Design a protein with these regions (language model features):
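Selective transmembrane helix interface/packing segments
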Residues: 1-243
């Protein structure tokens, strides 16, 4: 690729999003960018893993071995991660939290494959934040009475004195923005750093930055995935109240 999909081995410093090709849609010019290509690659990796895992579990043995061990370990760890913050409501959120965890994690660590991480594009992280925001307030309106919601919006003052209402409204609206910006900024900073290193070191960079890839892509990527999911579960649990 000429621009931006592959970061490693580049002679020029390039961490921008580029158009790969364009087409006309009802008279409007639409670009397919490096982000779209990288998202497609990430999705194909996840779908491929899911197909193999599904076939493996269809032939599952009572005593797990081989790839079945890997699949069961992943599921158990994801379920355990959801259990603590979500409590008795955890089974309802296994699929959602597990899905966004895997999608974000694979996107974050795709830099190990030389790709530009899709989560380094705010157009990817913002929908994830909005989706969580909608799920938070769906649970809030489902499990809390209007009176409880109003009291929460007026907190810490009594409900008949809504001085804090504007500030609490802003804090609610800021949830998807803060979630998405935190993930986007951390992943983008790692992408920029690696692009600068490759651009400045040139040929030497083919082997030396491997340790930095482990930090920026693997360690930092896993941490940001965990933080996003934990904040999501905390917000949802708070919205559900004692349900």
């Amino acid at each position: 690729m000429e621009h931006g999909i592959l970061l490693s081995g580049a002679d020029n410093i390039d961490f921008m999003i580029h158009g790969v090709f364009k087409y006309s849609f009802f008279g409007h010019e639409v670009w397919i960018t490096t982000t779209h290509v990288c998202v497609l690659i990430v999705m194909l990796i996840i779908i491929g893993f899911a197909i193999v895992a599904n076939r493996c579990m269809a032939k599952a043995r009572e005593v797990p071995e081989g790839f079945q061990n890997v699949v069961e370990l992943i599921v158990e760890k994801l379920d355990a991660m959801v259990d603590t913050p979500m409590g008795k409501a955890a089974p309802k959120f296994y699929n959602y939290i597990g899905t966004i965890f895997i999608v974000i994690l694979v996107s974050n660590i795709s830099g190990l494959l030389g790709l530009r991480p899709p989560t380094a594009d705010y157009g990817v992280t913002l929908p994830l934040g909005v989706l969580t925001f909608l799920l938070i307030h769906y649970n809030q309106f489902k499990y809390q009475k209007p009176k409880e919601i109003w009291e929460g919006m007026c907190s810490p003052l009594p409900p008949w004195l809504p001085i804090w209402l504007p500030i609490n409204l802003i804090s609610e609206i800021a949830v998807p923005i803060s979630l998405s910006l935190r993930l986007f900024a951390n992943v983008l900073s790692g992408t920029v750093m690696m692009a600068l290193i490759y651009g400045l070191l040139g040929v030497i960079a083919t082997a030396w930055p491997a340790a930095l890839h482990v930090y920026f892509d693997l360690f930092s990527g896993a941490i940001q995935t965990y933080v996003f999911c934990m904040l999501t579960m905390t917000y949802i649990a708070n919205a559900r109240g004692d349900a």
